C-alpha cells in the first residue's frame, strides 16, 4: 500500500530525479524506525552458490544502489543479496541528461547512464559503514576514458580495493553505454581479462585470508556461437559464476511507445524472454560447471521461476522492483519455497 502511494508520487517526477529521491530517502531511513514503511520479514529459503550461502534466491541487480548507500535499507526489504555499483576506479559523471526513460505501458526502462559514480574509494567507505549482515556483491567496470585495450587495469584496481568488503565481485563487460566495453566479451581480450582477474583473485585470497568469488555479467545481444565461446572461456579460466543478462539494444515489444527510440539499454518486461533464452543457452554450454544468476525483465514470481527452470540458481530484479515494489521479493521467495 505504502509503495503504491510512493510510486504514484515518484512516477510524476523525472526518472533520474525520482531515483535520487528514493536513494536519499532509503539512505536516511535504512537504520531508523522509519524503515517500517518498507521492511519485510521474509522466511529464509537458503541457496548455496559460489561457496556462499544466501538467505534467499532474490537479489537486487546492480545500478539501483551505485554507491552502496542503501544496503541496510534493501536488506530490511528482504533481498537475499544486494549488488552495488557499477563502480569505476575514478569518479565520472556519466552521459548527458536526460539519460533515463520510463516506458510505462510496457513496464520497461531505457537508460544510457554511462557508469556515473563517485569512484571506488567512495564506495569502499560506504561498504565499511554497513551495519547489517547483508550479502553484498560489488559490480565493477572501467572508466569511459580508459582505452579498451587497457581496460583490465581498471577492473584490477577496483577488485583490489573492494575485495575485503565484498561477498562476491561482478565483472561488468556488458553495459551498452560505455563505448567499446562489449568488445571485452570476445576473443583474446576476454581470455586476457578473465585470466588476469583469476590471478589477482588468487593473490588477494592469500593476502586477505578469504576467497571472494568472481562472476562475469554478460549481454543478452549475443549469438549462440558467441555464448558458446564465452562459456568456454569461463570454464577454462575457472571463473566462479555468470550473471545473465544486462540490458538489450533491441527494441522488441516497445515499438511505437513514447521514448522507445531513445538510445541506451532496454530493461524491464520486454527483456524477459530474451534474457531467459540466453540463460538457457548459457546453461546448456556450461553443463553445470558454473552457476548462473538470472536477471532481466523479471516482473512476477512466474518470470523468476522461468529463469530458474532455464538454468539459473538465483535471480536479480531491478526494473520489476521499480514497477512492483518490495512485494515482488516476497512473491518470488514464496514461489521458490513452494517449488
From Swiss-Prot:
Cofactor(s) essential for the protein: FMN
Gene Ontology MF terms: dihydroorotate dehydrogenase (quinone) activity
GO biological process entries: 'de novo' pyrimidine nucleobase biosynthetic process; 'de novo' UMP biosynthetic process
UniProt keyword terms in alphabetical order: Cell membrane, Flavoprotein, FMN, Membrane, Oxidoreductase, Pyrimidine biosynthesis
Subcellular location: Cell membrane
Top-level class of the enzyme under EC nomenclature: oxidoreductase
Stored CDD domains: DHOD_2_like (cd04738)
Keyword check for Cytoplasm: no
The family this protein is said to belong to: Belongs to the dihydroorotate dehydrogenase family. Type 2 subfamily.
Function: Catalyzes the conversion of dihydroorotate to orotate with quinone as electron acceptor.
Protein name (database record): Dihydroorotate dehydrogenase (quinone)
Biological source species: Shewanella pealeana (strain ATCC 700345 / ANG-SQ1)
Gene it is expressed from: pyrD
Amino acid at each position: 500500500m505504502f509503495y503504491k502511494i510512493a510510486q504514484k508520487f515518484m512516477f510524476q517526477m523525472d526518472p533520474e530525479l525520482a531515483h535520487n529521491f528514493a536513494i536519499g530517502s532509503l539512505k536516511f531511513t535504512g537504520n531508523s524506525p522509519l524503515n517500517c514503511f518498507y521492511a519485510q520479514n521474509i522466511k529464509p529459503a537458503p541457496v548455496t552458490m559460489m561457496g556462499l550461502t544466501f538467505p534467499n534466491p532474490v537479489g537486487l541487480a546492480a545500478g539501483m544502489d551505485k554507491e552502496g548507500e542503501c544496503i541496510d535499507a534493501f536488506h530490511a526489504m528482504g533481498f537475499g543479496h544486494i549488488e552495488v555499483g557499477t563502480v569505476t576506479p575514478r569518479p565520472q559523471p556519466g552521459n548527458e541528461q536526460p539519460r533515463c526513460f520510463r516506458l510505462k505501458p510496457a513496464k520497461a526502462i531505457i537508460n544510457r547512464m554511462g557508469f556515473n559514480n563517485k569512484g571506488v574509494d567512495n564506495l569502499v567507505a560506504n561498504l565499511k559503514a554497513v551495519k547489517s549482515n547483508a550479502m553484498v556483491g560489488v559490480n565493477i567496470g572501467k572508466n569511459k576514458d580508459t582505452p579498451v585495450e587497457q581496460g583490465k587495469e581498471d577492473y584490477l584496481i577496483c577488485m583490489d580495493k573492494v575485495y575485503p568488503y565484498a561477498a562476491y565481485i561482478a565483472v561488468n563487460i556488458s553495459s551498452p553505454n560505455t563505448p567499446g566495453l562489449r568488445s571485452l566479451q570476445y576473443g583474446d581480450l576476454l581470455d586476457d581479462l578473465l585470466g588476469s582477474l583469476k590471478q589477482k583473485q588468487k593473490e588477494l585470497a592469500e593476502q586477505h585470508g578469504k576467497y571472494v568469488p568472481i562472476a562475469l555479467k554478460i549481454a543478452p545481444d549475443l549469438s549462440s556461437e558467441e555464448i558458446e565461446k564465452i562459456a568456454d572461456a569461463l570454464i577454462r579460466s575457472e571463473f566462479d559464476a555468470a550473471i545473465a543478462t544486462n540490458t538489450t539494444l533491441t527494441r522488441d515489444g516497445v515499438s511505437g511507445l513514447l521514448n522507445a527510440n531513445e538510445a541506451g539499454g532496454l530493461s524491464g518486461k520486454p527483456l524477459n524472454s530474451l534474457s531467459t533464452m540466453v540463460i538457457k543457452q548459457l546453461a546448456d554450454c556450461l553443463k553445470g560447471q558454473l552457476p548462473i544468476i538470472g536477471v532481466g525483465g523479471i516482473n512476477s514470481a512466474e518470470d523468476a521461476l522461468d529463469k530458474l527452470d532455464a538454468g539459473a540458481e538465483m535471480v536479480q530484479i531491478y526494473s520489476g522492483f521499480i514497477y512492483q515494489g518490495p512485494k515482488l521479493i516476497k512473491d518470488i521467495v514464496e514461489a521458490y519455497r513452494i517449488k
